[in-house]
């Protein structure tokens, strides 16, 4: 089967979050199952800096963006059996970052138009065209409406994956003519219109042959007003083509037996290396080196979505316990300042690292006893799976992908891979936090059993890619 991905970012070339991880891992895994896979990405300046001497220049053409003709340079690099095609236009993509510009609408309108026209020029007409998030959500519409006259495109099936419904791509209706070069018929009849704006995500949901999200629970949640971001009505209407598939993680990278970023390796049968990593991490961040104290790790953006309003609200209560907390992340300045203040007030209990460091993140995943992730909503989440891979038990809000991947501890059966709370409140977060500390302190045997269960869970992309393969096959 020929499968083509189109996305705004993809590891190792460009990455700001989970979308980049998916594009870096899923195509590679699909190749192992015998599929022919291509990926189209923007050619950013950070891509040029890392891979500029490895990519191959193929050709260039021009694409109409409204009344203008814009340059499209095409580059290619084959990595892990996947053909990566890059769309090069320095005006749009050499900005020093991936998102956040005033003209993001124009940038990604250009990218989508160029990607659709590129398929024919590289002679890669896929059986399935898989697009991701709002940045590429207009592509199913373009294939079926603007470019329907291209005979080779008529049998292409399209899949849209929603990684985060909060970001929908809402723009003035004038964009249809001024950038996409199409008429207003589908806006006038309401197909593309939402809240008197052009809504790219709505277009993708309606025009794609299948819509997936990154966990089964999130697929159900976004059909409700609480999580639907005002598109729940549309998602209920299209629920027959909505599927949730949990993301995987790259188990070759996140492997406690071989991880090059760790000083001490370990496995589920011998966790002594994990304890050595704990001591090394405590020493590195300036906390007292103690084996007996529960070490709680946090690696996250510091935002309300990630639940840090609750964490800051309860942090004083947390620090009254015999516990150590290591935080790594940046985000809302108010949360950064709060953690910095508590770090100064409790230097023996809290290490607040307001930055991002890949090596330190890996050490926190591997050395902590508990990983705190109380997200308000979480489409999938990767950190909890990474933590479990290293025998670190997650404490999560029971929502989205966190619900699907973390089995809460059952005191009667001893089953469980972490701890969870259902009611999103400071009281229940603190209650669950204390329960986790109590189990760590008073029942080492149960704790070790949970660590083993967590490390045995299969979060590899092999499982997820088989589910996607079945989904693609069902469309043909």
UniProtKB/Swiss-Prot annotation:
**Top-rank EC class of the record's enzyme:** transferase
Is Transcription among this UniProt entry's keywords? Answer: no
Q: Which Gene3D superfamilies match?
A: Glycogen Phosphorylase B (3.40.50.2000)
* Pathway(s) served: Glycan biosynthesis; glycogen biosynthesis
Q: Which InterPro entries match?
A: Glyco_trans_1, GS/SS, Starch_synth_cat_dom
Query: Could you tell me the keywords of this UniProt record?
Result: Glycogen biosynthesis, Glycosyltransferase, Transferase
Which GO molecular-function terms appear in the entry?
alpha-1,4-glucan glucosyltransferase (ADP-glucose donor) activity; alpha-1,4-glucan glucosyltransferase (UDP-glucose donor) activity
EC number of the protein: 2.4.1.21
Query: Reaction catalysed?
Result: [(1->4)-alpha-D-glucosyl](n) + ADP-alpha-D-glucose = [(1->4)-alpha-D-glucosyl](n+1) + ADP + H(+)
Task: Cite a single Pfam family from the UniProt record.
Answer: Glyco_transf_5
Keyword flag Nucleotide-binding: no
Q: Supply one GO BP term.
A: glycogen biosynthetic process
Q: Where does ADP-alpha-D-glucose bind?
A: 15
Free-text function comment from the UniProt entry: Synthesizes alpha-1,4-glucan chains using ADP-glucose.
The entry sums up its family as follows: Belongs to the glycosyltransferase 1 family. Bacterial/plant glycogen synthase subfamily.
In Swiss-Prot or TrEMBL terms, this protein is called Glycogen synthase
> What gene does the UniProt entry assign to this protein?
glgA
């Amino acid at each position: 089967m020929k499968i083509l991905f189109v996305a705004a970012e993809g590891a190792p070339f460009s990455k700001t979050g989970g979308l980049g991880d998916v594009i870096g891992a899923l195509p590679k895994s699909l190749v192992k199952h015998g599929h022919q896979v291509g990926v189209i990405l923007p050619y950013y300046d950070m891509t040029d800096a890392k891979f500029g001497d490895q990519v191959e220049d193929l050709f260039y053409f021009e694409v109409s963006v409204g009344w203008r003709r814009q340059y499209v340079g095409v580059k290619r690099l084959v990595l892990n059996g996947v053909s990566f095609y890059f769309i090069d236009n320095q005006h749009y993509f050499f900005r020093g970052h991936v998102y956040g510009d005033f003209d993001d609408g124009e940038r990604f309108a250009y990218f989508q138009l160029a990607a659709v026209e590129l398929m024919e020029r590289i002679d890669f007409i896929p059986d399935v065209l898989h697009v991701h998030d709002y940045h590429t959500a207009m592509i199913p519409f373009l294939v079926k409406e603007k470019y329907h006259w291209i005979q080779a495109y008529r049998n292409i099936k399209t899949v849209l994956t929603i990684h985060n419904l909060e970001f929908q791509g809402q723009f003035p209706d004038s964009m249809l003519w001024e950038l996409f070069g199409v008429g207003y018929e589908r806006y006038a009849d309401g197909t593309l219109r939402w809240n008197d704006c052009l809504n790219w995500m709505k277009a993708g949901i309606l025009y794609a042959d299948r819509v997936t999200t990154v966990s089964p629970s999130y697929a159900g949640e976004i059909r409700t007003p609480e999580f639907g971001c005002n598109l729940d009505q549309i998602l209920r209407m299209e629920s027959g083509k909505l599927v949730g598939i949990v993301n995987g993680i790259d188990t070759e990278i996140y492997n406690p037996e071989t991880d090059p970023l760790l000083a001490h390796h370990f496995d589920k049968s011998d966790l002594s290396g994990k304890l050595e990593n704990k001591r090394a991490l405590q020493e590195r961040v300036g906390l007292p080196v103690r084996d007996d104290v529960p070490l709680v790790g946090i690696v996250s953006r510091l935002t309300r979505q990630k639940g840090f309003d609750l964490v800051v609200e309860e942090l004083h209560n947390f620090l009254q316990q015999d516990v150590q907390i290591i935080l790594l992340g940046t985000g809302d300045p108010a949360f950064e300042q709060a953690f910095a203040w508590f770090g100064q007030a409790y230097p023996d209990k809290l290490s607040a690292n307001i930055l991002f460091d890949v090596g330190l993140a890996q050490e926190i995943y591997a050395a902590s006893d508990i990983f705190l992730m109380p997200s308000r909503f979480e489409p999938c989440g990767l950190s909890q799976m990474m933590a479990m891979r290293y025998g670190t038990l997650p404490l999560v809000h029971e929502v989205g992908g966190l619900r699907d991947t973390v089995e809460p501890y059952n005191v009667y059966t001893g089953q469980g891979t972490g701890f969870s709370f259902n009611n999103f409140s400071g009281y229940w977060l603190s209650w669950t936090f204390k329960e986790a500390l109590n189990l760590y302190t008073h029942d080492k045997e149960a704790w070790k059993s949970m660590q083993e269960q967590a490390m045995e869970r299969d979060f590899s992309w092999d499982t997820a890619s088989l589910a996607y393969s079945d989904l693609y096959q069902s469309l043909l």
